[in-house]
């Protein structure tokens, strides 16, 4: 941590960051300043809701502007953090992605506070939906139940499915391979072929949408009524969410803001109140 600093260092850094914002804004023909102003207001509302707010997350902490407008609580120059290309760069003309943390127990309170404020100035805020799909193993289990195949057989088949970096191979990769990257799993293929129709049924089930949820952090914030930009639907808990998932909804011209929750902030707050 640097104890000494000079004003020119801060001005030069800020000039570089503002130049980057203007350059990208010109390239996409949209004022990126709106994003930073809105994000700053959301952080203010988190504090107003009585929640602690995380000091920073990810590469957003390397931007001096974020610190100056209270999005983050870390001085990147004092901490000797360079303004990195990962956060935003003219070669990638798009909006940055700032993640802000609040207390997990205050998630609903924070969301309602944000929604109340933006509704009051003629805007709208809505949670983003997520679609859960049948994975490789769950597709096999669903198909096995439908064909009345012994559960031990299905468990044996699922045990042969490789997992790379947290992701299971697809059924197609297990059965057919994937060019030069993945060879078919001979034992898997021989075992699944013993049960007529299992491979075809499981392969058709894999990837189907089977459940609806709420995005862990994403909210859509718009001017005017959200219905002008998309449509609503309800989760099983009667919560209003977007009818499209994040990527499809962004294609409709809206922008997602990330408000995450961290249980550690709850515990810190409890200690401070003790």
Task: Give the residues covered by each predicted segment.
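Alpha-helical scaffold/interaction cores of sigma-54-like transcription cofactors
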Residues: 1-274
């Amino acid at each position: 941590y640097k104890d000494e600093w000079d004003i020119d260092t801060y001005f030069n850094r800020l000039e570089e960051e503002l130049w980057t914002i203007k350059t990208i804004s010109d390239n996409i023909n949209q004022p990126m300043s709106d994003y930073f102003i809105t994000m700053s207001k959301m952080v203010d509302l988190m504090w107003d809701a009585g929640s602690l707010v995380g000091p920073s997350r990810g590469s957003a902490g390397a931007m001096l502007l974020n610190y100056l407008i209270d999005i983050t609580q870390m001085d990147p120059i004092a901490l000797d953090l360079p303004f990195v290309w990962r956060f935003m760069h003219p070669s990638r003309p798009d909006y940055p992605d700032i993640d802000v943390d609040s207390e997990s127990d205050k998630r609903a309170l924070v969301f309602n506070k944000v929604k109340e404020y933006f509704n009051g100035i003629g805007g709208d805020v809505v949670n983003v939906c997520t679609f859960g799909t049948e994975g490789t193993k769950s597709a096999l289990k669903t198909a096995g139940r439908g064909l009345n195949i012994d559960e031990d057989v299905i468990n044996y088949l699922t045990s042969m499915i490789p997992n790379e970096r947290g992701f299971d191979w697809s059924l197609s990769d297990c059965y057919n391979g994937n060019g030069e990257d993945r060879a078919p799993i001979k034992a898997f293929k021989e075992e699944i072929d013993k049960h007529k129709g299992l491979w075809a049924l499981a392969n058709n089930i894999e990837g189907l949408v089977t459940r609806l949820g709420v995005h862990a952090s994403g909210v859509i914030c718009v001017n005017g009524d959200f219905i002008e930009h998309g449509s609503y639907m309800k989760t099983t808990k009667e919560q209003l969410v977007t009818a499209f998932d994040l990527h499809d909804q962004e294609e409709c011209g809206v922008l997602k803001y990330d408000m995450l929750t961290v249980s550690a902030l709850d515990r810190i707050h409890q200690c401070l109140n003790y």
